[in-house]
């Protein structure tokens, strides 16, 4: 590792990818929660499959719009807190709250649940983009050499793998306790 970035810097940067754990919870557990398998007798489907797909499509359209907007704003920011940090700070808390909101839907009707999931999903992906896009753009900002970029990327990948494992196991344990 280079002398400019310390081992501690690499580890702290790698830990920053913890936001990815939230995305894995979304990817692996949200469909299960809203549309559990028929073998799960104590879990009731919250949405018809076609409504779940519509909510996911709406959320991803919002994601496709927010990605380049946040990227442009982050690249051109002149914030005194750093051009990337302000976005990550702005998105972090909403991302956590919106993740929790996914699992507390309005259950009055299929349409209400569809609208709720669509709105929460669109906001979730906007908050996710506020955290993830600037974080991933930090590598060229932090590293001055090819070796540093490679080391930062390796740390990010290592922690991403660890956080994926946590996201695969922990929610299953929590769901089984419900």
Regions flagged by a language model, labelled:
Residues 1-178:
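Membrane-embedded alpha-helical bundles of multi-pass transporters/translocases
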């Amino acid at each position: 590792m280079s002398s400019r970035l310390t081992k501690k810097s690499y580890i702290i940067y790698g830990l920053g990818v913890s936001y990815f754990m939230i995305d894995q919870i979304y990817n692996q557990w949200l469909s299960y929660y809203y549309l559990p398998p028929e073998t799960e007798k104590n879990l009731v489907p919250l949405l018809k499959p076609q409504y779940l797909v519509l909510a996911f499509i709406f959320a991803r359209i919002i994601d496709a719009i927010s990605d380049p907007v946040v990227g442009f704003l982050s690249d051109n920011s002149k914030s005194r807190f750093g051009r990337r940090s302000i976005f990550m700070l702005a998105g972090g808390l909403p991302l956590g709250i919106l993740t929790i909101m996914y699992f507390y839907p309005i259950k009055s009707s299929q349409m209400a649940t569809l609208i709720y999931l669509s709105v929460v999903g669109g906001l979730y992906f906007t908050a996710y983009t506020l955290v993830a896009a600037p974080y991933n753009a930090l590598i060229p900002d932090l590293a001055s050499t090819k070796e540093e970029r490679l080391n930062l990327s390796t740390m990010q990948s290592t922690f991403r793998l660890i956080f994926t494992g946590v996201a695969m196991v922990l929610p299953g344990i929590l769901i089984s306790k419900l």
